[in-house]
Amino acid sequence: MMNTSSHLKAQASCPLVEHFLRRKLSKENFDRFIPNRSAMDFDFANYALTQGRKRNVDEVTSASRKAYMTQLAEAMNQNRTRILAFRNKPKALLSSNHSDPPHQQPISVKPRRYIPQNSERVLDAPGIADDFYLNLLDWGSSNVLAIALGDTVYLWDASSGSTYKLVTIDEEEGPVTSINWTQDGLDLAIGLDNSEVQLWDCVSNRQVRTLRGGHESRVGSLAWNNHILTTGGMDGKIVNNDVRIRSSIVETYLGHTEEVCGLKWSESGKKLASGGNDNVVHIWDHRSVASSNPTRQWLHRFEEHTAAVRALAWCPFQASLLATGGGVGDGKIKFWNTHTGACLNSVETGSQVCSLLWSKSERELLSSHGFTQNQLTLWKYPSMVKMAELNGHTSRVLFMAQSPDGCTVASAAGDETLRLWNVFGEPPKTTKKAASKKYTDPFAHVNHIR
């Protein structure tokens, strides 16, 4: 038997002993492996020891059956041979929003909105003029839709569904060529073929006054900016009327050489967009319209369209963004930065662009068109990918108006129908009732007709 000194000398010179002595310092290496009973699958172990290895050696099978059995065994995990478990499965890491990599964090995907392809309601509009240069439809903030049919203006209360006639214009003054609600939805301006503009209080159903002297021919476009009523005529002039004073004409914009067929004030009331039959779009700065030099009155002049521009729409989520649409021979929707005057994008639609409306809650734009499809097209902005095409009209869709909640769109066409479309979805849910905007009553100091 080896003595103690020789035994220690042998241990010191043996590399295996030295190796095992160092392994004791490691937490990853062990000299014994004891199965973890709580992690074992005893049912499978019993099956594997008793039945799992039985094979019928005389069984004759086809190649296809062998392949099937192989796939089945893999799917059912039948060929596993490991029975003992020496460690538990690692615990799942606790999620931490601030430490997880971006690709592991859950991504909120907004479900795609369902857009009905058919109009939800169709109303008759007999006698509506099929004239690209007129504006005969408007939806007020009091949820009343106004439409001009020949010499008569009708009001449809969308809340109650009732319809009534507001006024029939005398034959020598009519027909009606434009209508536009005040911002509080209580008063209506009516432009006429004889160059006059009538102002009506629709609560009491009475005429308040008549504006004369601003134009020499029909008034085809109107736009309110609080107490200022802006009118555009076939004579190419744009006139600002302060309806609070007797001599209402306060400013005249000179720039268009042909009929003004589109007028829109920005939400702030600081800029006015005008479109004309001269294929020109002007941006006017309300703070500098009184310039003594008429050739410098406009802020910007856009001449890129190749046809009349009637469709104008200010963006609700980007104050300086304006969308414009060209008529037959152009068919383009253009986007402008009205701060710099730059054209941001131009999209070919393939047909006459009659009207444009922005969604109030989504980054979407709705356009109405003429020949060949007479459709409404919903676009995703800024990609300008088509989201939907709405068909139903059999004539060019000249007029569109948006409900106060921004969800429903009314369209009117030369086919003498008025259609309602649920194109912009449901109104956004709010926890608190939004404070309504307060507008100055434009007729606060007017108590007579002139």
From Swiss-Prot:
GO molecular function: anaphase-promoting complex binding; kinase binding; ubiquitin-protein transferase activator activity
TM region positions: none
Record's subcellular location: Nucleus
InterPro entries assigned to the protein according to its UniProt record, in alphabetical order: Cdc20/Fizzy (IPR033010), WD40/YVTN_repeat-like_dom_sf (IPR015943), WD40_CDC20-Fz (IPR056150), WD40_repeat_CS (IPR019775), WD40_repeat_dom_sf (IPR036322), WD40_rpt (IPR001680)
Domain of life of the native organism: Eukaryota
WD repeat residue intervals: 129-166, 171-210, 214-251, 255-294, 304-346, 348-389, 392-431
Alphabetical GO biological process terms: cell division; protein ubiquitination
One cellular component (GO) term of this entry: nucleus
One family name in Pfam for this protein: WD40_CDC20-Fz
Alphabetized UniProt keyword annotations: Cell cycle, Cell division, Mitosis, Nucleus, Repeat, Ubl conjugation pathway, WD repeat
Keyword Cell cycle tagged: yes
Recorded metabolic or biological pathway in which this protein acts: Protein modification; protein ubiquitination
SMART domains documented for this protein: WD40
SUPFAM superfamilies, A to Z: WD40 repeat-like (SSF50978)
UniProt keyword annotation of Transmembrane helix present: no
Family according to the record: Belongs to the WD repeat CDC20/Fizzy family.
Biological role stated in the UniProt entry: Component of the anaphase promoting complex/cyclosome (APC/C), a cell cycle-regulated E3 ubiquitin-protein ligase complex that controls progression through mitosis and the G1 phase of the cell cycle.
Record note on quaternary structure: The APC/C is composed of at least 11 subunits that stay tightly associated throughout the cell cycle. Binds to GIG1 and PYM. Part of the mitotic checkpoint complex (MCC); interacts with MAD2 and BUB1.
Protein name: Cell division cycle 20.5, cofactor of APC complex
